[in-house]
Amino acid sequence: MSEEALGELSGYIRERLGDAIEEANLAYGELTLCVPVASLIGVLTFLRDDVQCQFVNLTDISGVDYPQREKRFDVVYQLLSPRQNQRIRVKVQADEDTLVPSAVPVFFGAEWYEREAYDMYGILFSGHPDLRRILTDYGFEGHPLRKDFPLTGFVEVRYNDELKRVVYEPVQLRQEFRNFDFLSPWEGTDYVLPGDEKAKTN
């Protein structure tokens, strides 16, 4: 879609919704609307129902973690209007305690997307019909896509053949730290390490 058409759409939405839109950005051929949490459901409903918009498809909800910010999470809604052949992105900011209103009453397909955002980031959605983990195990500790979550995790899950069941154990890094010599004679160096001499063939 052209920048001009996106600019017109942005102006129309800001004119109709007023203070419900904190910011509208055009970047890389896409329109992003930043809205306060309290206005989210009204904005999503308008974008779905308005004749000029008709964003009837919710294609994704994702989280983004910025731990240095006071409101560390962005909740990002990707919408599609097949009739208008347009895409739009809606963002709200939240912290660990902010209740983001569930989009399920507006887009029924939001249910599993919100469960995933809760599972991976710990973002809380108020009014969600079944807010529980969807990808990690039920006893999982923490939220694995947060920037402060350790790469190794907290527990190791494996099948124990003696007990004939899955067991949870604290993570044990079984390999000591190793300092690798990256100066390999096989990578085009102009020197030969002792013991790596090639036999002469002529």
Swiss-Prot record:
Cellular component terms per the entry's GO annotation: plasma membrane
Catalytic activity, EC: 7.1.1.-
Principal cellular location given in the protein's record: membrane
Domain of life: Bacteria
PROSITE patterns: COMPLEX1_30K
Catalytic activity: a quinone + NADH + 5 H(+)(in) = a quinol + NAD(+) + 4 H(+)(out)
Keyword Ligase: no
GO molecular function, one term: quinone binding
Chain ranges passing through the membrane: none
Keywords: Cell inner membrane, Cell membrane, Membrane, NAD, Quinone, Translocase, Transport, Ubiquinone
One Pfam family recorded for the sequence: Complex1_30kDa
Function noted in UniProt: NDH-1 shuttles electrons from NADH, via FMN and iron-sulfur (Fe-S) centers, to quinones in the respiratory chain. The immediate electron acceptor for the enzyme in this species is believed to be ubiquinone. Couples the redox reaction to proton translocation (for every two electrons transferred, four hydrogen ions are translocated across the cytoplasmic membrane), and thus conserves the redox energy in a proton gradient.
Family statement drawn from the similarity comment of this UniProt entry: Belongs to the complex I 30 kDa subunit family.
Name used for this protein in its record: NADH-quinone oxidoreductase subunit C
Gene responsible for this protein: nuoC
